[in-house]
């Protein structure tokens, strides 16, 4: 539902890409579920806000994806749900995403979700093979739950209670803190680059190869 539909001021169709732009001073309230198909880019500009109510879902299917610019935000207790791995289009957050669940599943060859801002979640769940969560900002989540074929590249700060993934790469000077580092039945790797730090305050299952750090 578009509770504040008149504030969605810009819809641009170019090169077969349909763009929904939430500009400064505008808010889009999702109270139930909204689904976007084919090639749709949702852009949250500086000062724009998407609010997803509890039990509501923003669904992005096929080649649909999101771009949150610095100063933009997606807030609420609801869900962002990506199917078909955005057909290879990169999802990008340089603002704030603070919601209940970020879920990536379905077919496709995986999706890159790039975080250069703040990503706060109750749960991150990824099951599409090849999906990579790349962090150059701050990620705080209660649960990070990826299967054997999903990956995390952390270049800055990440904190979670449960930490499960296929392959983890810790970039230079990066830090990750978890309460439980779980196994997932696959001997995937953890790569620690120079001056990176991975801290587990509780149970750690290291059925995997850990390389580094060398400095």
Region annotations inferred by a language model:
Residues 1-215:
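Extracellular beta-strand-rich, repetitive "passenger/adhesive" scaffolds
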